Curated annotation (Swiss-Prot):
Organism (species): Calliphora vomitoria (Blue bottle fly)
Keyword hit for Secreted: yes
In-chain residues carrying the UniProt-annotated modification Phenylalanine amide: 9
Protein name: CalliFMRFamide-4
Superkingdom, taxonomy of origin: Eukaryota
Recorded family membership: Belongs to the FARP (FMRFamide related peptide) family.
Lineage, top ranks: Eukaryota, Metazoa, Ecdysozoa, Arthropoda, Hexapoda
Keywords, in A-Z order: Amidation, Neuropeptide, Secreted
Gene Ontology CC terms, in alphabetical order: extracellular region
Keyword set includes Ribosomal protein: no
Amino acid sequence: KPNQDFMRF
């Protein structure tokens, strides 16, 4: 899910 990319940090 690309939406979870914001939680990669």
